Amino acid sequence: LAEHGARIVVNDLGGAVDGTGHSDAADSGVEEIRAAGGEAVANKASVSDREGARSIVETAVREYGTVDIVVNNAGILRDKSFKKMTLDEWDLVINVHLNGSAYVTWHAWPIMYEKNFGRVIFTSSVSGILGSFGQSNYGAAKMGMVGLMNNLSREGASHNIHVNCLSPGAATRMTASVPGSDIDADNPE
């Protein structure tokens, strides 16, 4: 997006895959964008916190005057079978993926609605559509994003707000421990 002139708010709460510690992932993303000639600022608020979500949108408005595009891509995993999962692990994943996406979008929505332009992208997952062992919380959150996208795309259409959902399979540092993650997608045999 930055290569095409978008001015970016890079949001990342930081931390290791298990949520411990601290990282400067948002700062690293900003540095990478700036090194390539783009404009970016960091925000380290949690999308799962309503005020944190508000601060992400407020950062865009303060720095760039508006918000045109929201990419809901925050993620966290707490993979366990449903039987072994705690309700806190359930809530954490639902809050980051589904509620966090709704919160950030909710804060940006009036801005987009008022100016009759906006783009919202949800990053869902094939785990929401097809299911994946040990990911009931994740799959439910990701399928919830599809439902939210379907409804918001209807609500935003008359105001030139396009809402879409990507549902990729993933190979990231968070998915390295997921059963079956060692399959080579280019050579699945």
Residue ranges and their predicted role:
Residues 23, 44-58, 87:
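The beta1-alpha1 cofactor-binding region of Rossmann-like NAD(H)/NADP(H)-dependent oxidoreductases
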Residues 36-39, 59-72, 78-81, 117, ...:
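A glycine-rich helix->loop->beta "capping" turn
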Residues 125:
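Residue(s) in the substrate-gating loop at a strand-loop-helix junction
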Residues 105, 141:
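Active-site helix of classical SDR
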Residues 81-82, 86-94:
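Substrate-binding pocket helix/loop in short-chain dehydrogenase/reductase
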